[in-house]
Amino acid sequence: MERQRHRAFVITAAIAALAVVGGAHRAGAEQGIDLDGLTLRQAAAELCAGKITSKALTSAALARAKATGNLNAFITLDEAGAMKAASAFDAAHTRRSACKPLGGVPVVIKDNIEVAGLPSTAGTPALKNFIPRKDAPVAARLRDAGAVIIGKTNMHELAFGISGYNAAFKSGPEPGVRSAYDSTRIAGGSSSGTAAAIGTRIVTAGLGSDTGGSVRIPCALNGCASLRPTVGRYPGEGIAPISHTRDTAGPMAATIADVAVLDRVIAGGGPIAPANPKEVRIGVVAAMLANLDDDTDVAFRAALDKLRKAGVTVVDVDMPKLADLNGQVGFPVALYEAYDDMVAYLKRTGTGITIEELAKQIASPDVKGTYDGLVIPRKLPGPDNSVVDGKPAYDAAMKTARPALQALYRDTFTKDRLDAIAFPTVPKVAIPANPESSSLANFTLFIQNTDPGSNAGVPGIQVPVALGATSKLPVGLELDGPSGSDRRLLAIGMALERIFGRLPAPSAH
């Protein structure tokens, strides 16, 4: 009953908001805290110095979350738990205890990543009552570093999509997680709510997960920064899966410098300094410049010009057979592994829910079609709208195509002496939020550039570069680097964001 009353309150607050962005701005201003300009590093420093309290910052974040309820960014908003954690930080801080890296900083966690005591739905109705008893390791590391978890964020159902148009969970009048910059547009996915919460300046940081673009696509559409780490860099336990070969948790934040803080908390290592732009060599692959809308094309080319002027070496490179190899890996691996990985996960939850029961309750037509037609029967799309057995294609992908794709990346970085390849994270700015946003055509388009690196297992960062000249919506640039080069990639990203500057807040443009 308490959770029902809380949900009713959130929905009422969302509908009552006369102006979402204006109301969000006032929610922060009333606390004397500039949420619009705050970064994770600044928040941690000011909390440590005693310039602000965690109670004030957390209260401001919660107020803005309620004021922006029609964005559907949250599935669960844990006001009581967050304020308790914030108060505990403030009490400890008065005793001059050492400051932790995230001490007192409000963060959000995607709802397929387990947090003790809060529902972990993976955005699907069958799991709405699953409440884990312990944190997933990635969430535990943020909490151990002092983070205050204010809630679990909405997502594309079961992480199987790029739009975030999920009808199963909403706090506003219309379904689908909405863009921080235009509530009629998609937030992207599948880590939709985390990106929307950061873009709306509710929080400065959070966690998502990424199989084929799910921390990078929504950050590109909401003006935030993110890292898809090298597969295996972060622990994957306690996260509702798609594919053990491709899945990884990923940090999302206001800036790449903030992402670097989260990476250190999760993976360890010392501070990361920005790279010298004059010592950075970046390749551009022509095939990744296909299907761009005008705003993305203009913004990306302008970003490359800025990099050249700052001393970055930018060269054209060729990656032959990239699309062909990627096609032989992507769907065969994700769709085939999804069955066994989800069965194992459901068993571990102890809910007694079977994968068939899970599929029966799926609310999103696109995801239900994928589960019923492909995942459950272990099939793959075939020619002329047919389906074929998934096992032969999966075996071929793992034995031949994926190693060849990894070799292509490795050889390209080595032969052309590249630190990274650069490309528009997504080909278009955010599209209208409606059921059609989850179409197969849109899915294929939006993963065009993020999917290949995912299948190769290499790290990638998303850096905001501009607002589109016509749309005034965020445009992002991605850098993919060699396997294991996560820290070098973050250093380059920190240098790049100094060149590009931070995007204006939604209330300021």
Task: Name what the model sees in each region.
Residues 58-59, 87, 295-320, 343-362, ...:
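Acyltransferase
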Residues 30-211, 230, 302-305, 310, ...:
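Gly/Ser-rich catalytic/binding loops embedded in alpha/beta enzyme cores
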Residues 50, 104, 144, 203, ...:
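Glycine-rich, small-residue loops and helix-cap segments
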Residues 102-122, 279-281, 336-404, 462-473:
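Short helix-loop capping/hinge segments that flank enzyme active sites or metal/cofactor-binding pockets
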Residues 67, 148, 199-290, 301-310, ...:
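Structural helix-boundary/capping segments
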